[in-house]
Amino acid sequence: MTDKMTILTIDLEDWFHILDFKQTQSENTWISYESRIEKLTSKLLKFLEQKQVKATFFILGWVAKNFPNVVKDIHASGHEIACHSNLHQLVYKMTQESFKRDTMDALDNIEASCGVRPIAYRAPGFSITAQTPWAFDTLADAGIKYDCSVFPAPRSHGGLIGYGAGIPAIIRTINDKEVREFPINYVNLMGRKIVYSGGGYFRL
């Protein structure tokens, strides 16, 4: 019998970074909002410690820049430090150059906060699509070894339907580089692909 592996990942972003909340999408307004990052991350770290669970934290570069002590605490608690972009923008609405700039800014901000340069990435809203294959080359060039951006089913922010089964695989990029992909998994239910995990379910 093959043991099944369960991976816990957490996207570290604040309430005003939600993609579908248009009133707070301007970066210039973020610093004026009351942040919940410090208080809630502290509670989460205590809970994970009690349960003896380690997680991968996909962290916004903006969060790392503005709350470096939070990222230091996550790292000191033994969790993996990963990247969730810098400004939480949808990849398919960016150019390749702006995506590269956002990714590098995020990696720099995260490294400056805790001394660790991430090798894992997750796009905001799982927004790498069939129209943005260049994103994987950009990630590989930035030193990203594995990615968790693929949503292999239709969704409001795109989805990469042509990926196939929701299982890990090696993605070969346009420029013949490799990125190991850990996609979101799903079940087939009445002819439809249904993703059964994710923070969205906690918002119902």
Residue ranges and their predicted role:
Residues 2-77, 122:
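Active-site beta->alpha N-cap acidic-glycine motif
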Residues 26, 74-76, 99-102, 137-140, ...:
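Short, hinge-like loop/turn segments at secondary-structure boundaries
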Residues 40-50, 54, 96-132, 138-146:
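CE4/NodB-like, metal-dependent polysaccharide N-deacetylase domain
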Residues 10-12, 57-61, 83-87, 122-125, ...:
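A cross-domain feature marking catalytic cores of carbohydrate-active enzymes
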Residues 116-117, 123-204:
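Active-site-adjacent pocket scaffolds in enzyme catalytic domains
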Residues 2-6, 51-55, 76-81, 114-119, ...:
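Short, well-ordered coil/turn segments that N-cap beta-strands
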